[in-house]
């Protein structure tokens, strides 16, 4: 937050949402060895962890985690515990295991780390040209490159690095970080489409945990359906319901246009 950036800025919510899009694609590149439930929950755990420490600059945050990680994790868990009572399915117990058992979800942690660096690098590519004279910018560039290189610990990372189309797909999705929801209405705070999609995904997952013995595939599908549900808006923008309902049949026409745009622009970027 101490560099010049676009006037809309960057929010932690949108960053965490973008990270989960990267995590999904990296997991698919890795293949069947990924436990998608652990990946989903790990992403939510790390989001909540970052919320508690959100005012700390990233370099300081990473240094603290590296040197005092166990103490910080325990403190964060104690801060979050009272707020987790309403989430069923043993969610908070798994969160404690995620942070206190270093062998738990090891592959999924690697994927989420890589996703974090990719989302951060997407931001940095925007910030860098705006800050050529800012003190320390070249050091940040070097640290970003080193951080990404250090994530080369699983096959899916290398597969993704060699796929121009998948990289373009996730760069395109990044545009949702700048699309304001209900732009003609006053919303405090302002919310953007990408962050909204993550909120829907997390709430869908939490509601799914309340079901009687939900199958793993249902949990996975409910989360990622929520995460991707507004993807066509990267091509059509956020057309609000009052506009869609103002003319009879307009909503159907918009849906047809969205389908057409998905076929022409999005699907060719996917394997």
Over which residues does each language-model region extend?
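Alpha-helical, largely C-terminal catalytic domains
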Residues: 1-271
């Amino acid at each position: 937050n101490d560099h010049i950036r676009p006037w809309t800025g960057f929010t932690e919510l949108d960053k965490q949402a973008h990270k989960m899009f990267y995590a999904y694609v990296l997991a698919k590149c890795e293949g069947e060895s990924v436990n998608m439930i652990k990946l989903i929950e790990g992403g939510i755990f790390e989001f909540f962890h970052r919320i508690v420490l959100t005012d700390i600059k990233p370099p300081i945050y990473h240094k603290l985690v590296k040197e005092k990680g166990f103490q910080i994790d325990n403190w964060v868990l104690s801060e979050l515990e009272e707020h987790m009572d309403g989430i069923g399915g043993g969610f908070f117990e798994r969160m404690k295991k995620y942070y206190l058992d270093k062998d738990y979800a090891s592959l999924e942690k690697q994927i989420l780390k890589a996703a974090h660096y990719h989302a951060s690098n997407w931001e940095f590519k925007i910030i860098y040209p705006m800050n050529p004279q800012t003190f320390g910018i070249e050091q940040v560039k070097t640290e970003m490159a080193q951080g990404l290189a250090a994530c080369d610990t699983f096959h899916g990372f290398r597969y993704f690095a060699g796929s121009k189309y998948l990289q373009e797909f996730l760069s395109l999705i990044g545009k949702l970080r700048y699309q304001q929801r209900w732009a003609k209405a006053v919303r405090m705070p302002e919310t953007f489409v990408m962050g909204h999609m993550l909120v829907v995904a997390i709430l869908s997952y939490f509601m799914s945990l309340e079901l009687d013995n939900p199958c793993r595939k249902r949990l996975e599908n409910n989360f990622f359906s929520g995460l991707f549900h507004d993807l066509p808006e990267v091509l059509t923008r956020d057309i609000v319901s009052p506009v869609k309902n103002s003319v009879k049949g307009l909503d159907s026409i918009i849906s047809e246009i969205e389908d057409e745009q998905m076929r022409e622009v999005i699907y060719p970027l996917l394997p």
